[in-house]
């Protein structure tokens, strides 16, 4: 599978919804931790005679995505893509997993307290996990 600018260590799961990533500036060592959805929801008109809208998924721009940090994107524009390493740390199967593991990774690395990171905010809104995920977690 073509992964664009991203380095992947291991196979890309077919059912992956998104991933947690790290971008490293080779010149100064600064890093950025974030998440990206690989699929996006498309709402379509209902079929003739039906009332409910249809939901489809389409591949997002993840292969060329460079993060949402303004400071990071300015550095990428001025220094060039070749001065950065784009690594996928973990694949996730749901929005909940994506938000949870991004926040977990950011808190474990103290991204807001360190000058070594581009991250300026940990923006996360997480509810109760799906029962299926809890069962997986407790059965490991």
What is each stretch, according to the model?
Residues 1-140:
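Structure-specific nucleic-acid interaction/processing domains
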């Amino acid at each position: 599978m073509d992964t664009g600018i991203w380095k992947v260590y291991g196979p890309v799961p077919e059912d992956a919804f998104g991933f947690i990533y790290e971008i490293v500036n080779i010149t100064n060592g600064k890093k950025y931790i974030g998440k990206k959805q690989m699929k996006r929801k498309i709402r379509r008109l209902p079929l003739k005679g039906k009332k409910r809208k249809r939901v489809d998924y389409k591949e997002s721009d993840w292969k060329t995505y460079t993060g949402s940090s303004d400071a990071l994107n300015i550095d990428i524009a001025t220094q060039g893509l070749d001065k950065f390493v784009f690594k996928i740390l973990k694949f996730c199967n749901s929005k909940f997993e994506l938000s949870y593991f991004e926040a977990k990774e950011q808190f474990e690395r103290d991204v807001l307290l360190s000058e070594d990171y581009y991250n300026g905010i940990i923006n996360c809104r997480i509810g109760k996990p799906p029962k299926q995920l809890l069962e997986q977690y407790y059965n490991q």
